[in-house]
From Swiss-Prot:
The gene is tmk. It comes from Protochlamydia amoebophila (strain UWE25). This is Thymidylate kinase. The keyword Methyltransferase does not apply. Keywords: ATP-binding, Kinase, Nucleotide biosynthesis, Nucleotide-binding, Transferase. It catalyses: dTMP + ATP = dTDP + ADP. One of its GO terms (cellular component) is cytosol. Phosphorylation of dTMP to form dTDP in both de novo and salvage pathways of dTTP synthesis. ATP binds at G15, G16, E17, G18, S19, G20, K21, S22. Gene3D superfamilies: P-loop containing nucleotide triphosphate hydrolases (3.40.50.300). Its EC number is 2.7.4.9. PANTHER family: THYMIDYLATE KINASE, UMP-CMP KINASE 2, MITOCHONDRIAL.
Amino acid sequence: MPSTKFKGYFITIEGGEGSGKSTLLNQLGDYFRNKGFEVIQTREPGGTKLGESIRHLLLNHEDSISIGHQAELLLFLAARAQHIEELIQPALKAGKIVLCDRFNDSTIAYQGAARGLNAKKIQEFCQLVCAEILPNWTLFLDVSPEIGLARTQKIQKVHAQMGQLDRIESEKIEFHERVRQAFLSLVQQEPQRIYRIDANESQSKVLQKALEFLEEQWSDSELKT
């Protein structure tokens, strides 16, 4: 089990578009609450009033604002800095489980590998923003970009959004393939922290795999609280 100076645990869920992160986040939240844990569910960018405003700016087509790659990176990091200070760190200090949809790994994959920004500089920026706030464990939901984007469009049509993809979802398929390959590389670099799950499987199978991994990380006494 990774060492931590906080009483709580920080679990992040990563993956490309349409990989099922939000669904798994909700399922894990229910699971841990039923075990008696206090749980915070959050997302990036977002999680705070400032973060959600930045999210709208970054993802929305409506405003017709041109955002350069470096500006995009810094906006994501600004949202994260506020997220950590306002929500994540206090929750971890209070002994809660924090479940977060995206964190540093997404920045490395999207702004680094896919956008082509300097990987070393991104690591330095992330370290500056996060300091000691790092995930105990990360679940990477691996799905092909073609399948993931098709899922996303289907979900949006169901919610009467006319299947419109957001600013990042609408990037070319090559962009999303670079994102996937970056995540796979991170899994190889940090196998003890990051666990790959085949997100082409059913939602129940994905949840089963996630719980099997997480249950191995905790002692029985902690999980049976």
